[in-house]
Amino acid sequence: MHTLGDIAKTINAKLVGDSNVEITGVASSLYANQTQLTYIINSKYKQTLIHSKAGVVILNKDLLRICPTNALVVDNVYLAFAKATHLFKKQNVCYQGIHPSAKINNAKIAPNCIIGRNVSIGNHCIIASNVVIEDNVTIGNYALIQPNVSILQGCSIGDNIVISPGVVIGSEGFGNAQDQQKHWHSIAHLGYVVIGNNVSIGANTTIDRGTIEDTQIHNGVRIDNLVHIAHNVIIEQDSAIAATVTIGGSCKLGKRCMVGGGATITSHVNLADDIIITGASTVDKNLSEQGHYTGFTSISKHQKWKKIQVWLLNLDKIVHYLNIKLKKLKEK
């Protein structure tokens, strides 16, 4: 918990409001309450600002006149937000072995595991050797967690989970802000990873925690080896992700989606339910209609892509034909 006066000093902001107000955490601009801090990056979100119930908003001076609550006025909003997040970052306490506060039911724990404070592990779980489970993690029943897995602070795992060797759940997301000298400042990721029931996660997959809200993997999802899932991603029920797929930050995949091996989904892309992505494709825009999509430069409907591929393979013949036609026209 920090007062607005303390926060203003930390981020070098002009405080407009009560310096004694206490702030307990950070939330998105849509959901922040009177004890939480949020930020508004530009005038695109002015309607959100007008209706904000946040305890304080980081913003620039142009938006101050419509701010209904306490304000921290800065020139570089994103940089100030990045600095503010570190005030609310919970530090994991390193501990050797199993912390006495951990609640472990009928589970088998192999040697060399580290289990932190206030961890809860359900019935009939198997925790293999060299697994690290940090503070405040919750694991349901019948989980199989294989060697060298790391489940980091505050994450939640459902029932009937299989987590293969080398998986990292809850790693810090790739969020950074630049100052005037183009130096980078990291954003502390305050969200968690929440994984539902009946999920399988392949070896050496990494799932980043959310920036403010949680990264979510819903019931029945299947994830292959070497997949990277960035911060704030939501993967809905019964979707399947093949090996070496990269899913950028803040993407949302609908129910029953299938993503082929080696595909890339760039940040802030939404996929509707029942979408199939061909392996090695690059998805760089929202797909709102179910179907099979393929594309290695820009994504398109699969049937259209097949026609384009035929044209590309015969492009030299088409050019040769057109040159002959052009020559004949010139001779007339």
From Swiss-Prot:
Catalyzes the N-acylation of UDP-3-O-acylglucosamine using 3-hydroxyacyl-ACP as the acyl donor. Is involved in the biosynthesis of lipid A, a phosphorylated glycolipid that anchors the lipopolysaccharide to the outer membrane of the cell. The keyword Phosphoprotein does not apply. Belongs to the transferase hexapeptide repeat family. LpxD subfamily. The lineage of its organism: Bacteria, Pseudomonadati, Pseudomonadota, Gammaproteobacteria, Candidatus Pseudothioglobaceae. This is UDP-3-O-acylglucosamine N-acyltransferase. Gene3D superfamilies: Hexapeptide repeat proteins, MurE/MurF, N-terminal domain. It catalyses: a UDP-3-O-[(3R)-3-hydroxyacyl]-alpha-D-glucosamine + a (3R)-hydroxyacyl-[ACP] = a UDP-2-N,3-O-bis[(3R)-3-hydroxyacyl]-alpha-D-glucosamine + holo-[ACP] + H(+). Transmembrane segments: none annotated. It holds the Pfam family Hexapep.
